[in-house]
């Protein structure tokens, strides 16, 4: 259904392809021409610079006074150990700061699994290597401070504020709080009916495992929306003198589900759930429909395909539904 030339298309499809637990592709379409880059660049910047997370900020290693030194029996120098600790993926519940301890002796690798912590802390990648001990008599003991923050804060930004109270041997670490390790977006061509000048936004991202990629996208979009809220009221400053009245709902939403010509099984399942109009159906989610007795994935796929052919989808939000014309029936 083609709207006015002055109206903006709203994305009707959000597809999330979970490549792995830390890697996902998110596709958003259709978008007006140019909006692919507008939204893609904004989300990319937020995901890289503004996502909250936890990171190592300070380390104390027994027998080490400064970062430009080495430790007997340890293969890596202290700078390399600090670099490895920066890659530690930690999830902390209910606290802004925790102290972790690590004690290891004997030949072999020292990994994140050797860190001692309480129940509020989860080491996401326990196989992450911190250093290697090269002697049977070698040992390493350290205390690791993990803090919650946002973005990237270099150690140099904290040196001057903490210089007076920082004891010798406490090593500051550049803190990269963002759980997003890689983010890239691509804008492809999309088509709706006769329009071929539309955008499709494809975002590919990887996280460190402390946050699900889908949740990261959701948080970034929320941050962007909250920042733009200050401008929302400005849109009502100018009101057109004459405004053509439009129907409150798309007429297709007011039609009965029988018009979708679903199979008898699918139609009966919907009626059993008191889903009589297409407007009732599009507000349901996939999860809700799968809970319907006798409605399986095959029927769900059929419903999604039929809705998509009409430019609709599940999970839509309809304000003031049902309309008075239906509610009175």
Swiss-Prot record:
Residues 249-329 are annotated as: Alpha C-terminal domain (alpha-CTD). The N-terminal domain is essential for RNAP assembly and basal transcription, whereas the C-terminal domain is involved in interaction with transcriptional regulators and with upstream promoter elements. Transmembrane segments: none annotated. The gene is rpoA. This is DNA-directed RNA polymerase subunit alpha. Belongs to the RNA polymerase alpha chain family. GO terms for biological process: DNA-templated transcription. Keywords: DNA-directed RNA polymerase, Nucleotidyltransferase, Transcription, Transferase.
């Amino acid at each position: 259904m083609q709207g006015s030339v002055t109206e903006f298309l709203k994305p009707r499809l959000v597809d999330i392809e979970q490549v792995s637990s830390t890697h996902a592709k998110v596709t958003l379409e259709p978008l007006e021409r140019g909006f692919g880059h507008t939204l893609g660049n904004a989300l990319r910047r937020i995901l890289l610079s503004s996502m909250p997370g936890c990171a190592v900020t300070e380390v104390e290693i027994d027998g080490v006074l400064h970062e430009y030194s080495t430790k007997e029996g340890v293969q890596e120098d202290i700078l390399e150990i600090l670099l490895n600790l920066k890659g530690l993926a930690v999830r902390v519940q209910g606290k802004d700061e925790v102290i972790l301890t690590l004690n290891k002796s004997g030949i072999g690798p020292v990994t994140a699994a050797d860190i001692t912590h309480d129940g509020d802390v989860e080491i996401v990648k326990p196989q992450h290597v911190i250093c290697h001990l090269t002697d049977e008599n070698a040992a390493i003991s350290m205390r690791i401070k993990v803090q919650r923050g946002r973005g990237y804060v270099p150690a140099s930004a904290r040196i001057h504020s903490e210089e007076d109270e920082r004891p010798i041997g406490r090593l500051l670490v550049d803190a990269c709080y963002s759980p997003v390790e890689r983010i890239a977006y691509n804008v492809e061509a999309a088509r709706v009916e006769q329009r071929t000048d539309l955008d499709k936004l494809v975002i590919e991202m990887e996280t460190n495992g402390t946050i699900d990629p889908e949740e990261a996208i959701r948080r970034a979009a929320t941050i962007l929306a909250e920042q733009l809220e200050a401008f929302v009221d400005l849109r009502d400053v100018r009101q057109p003198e004459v405004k053509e009245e439009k129907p409150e709902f798309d007429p297709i939403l007011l039609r009965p589900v029988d018009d979708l010509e679903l199979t008898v099984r699918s139609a009966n399942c919907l009626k059993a759930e008191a889903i009589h109009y297409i407007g009732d159906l599009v507000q349901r989610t996939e999860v809700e429909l799968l809970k319907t007795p006798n409605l399986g994935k095959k029927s769900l796929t059929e419903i999604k395909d039929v809705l998509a052919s009409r430019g609709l989808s599940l999970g839509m939000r309809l304000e003031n539904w049902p309309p008075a014309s239906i509610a009175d029936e």
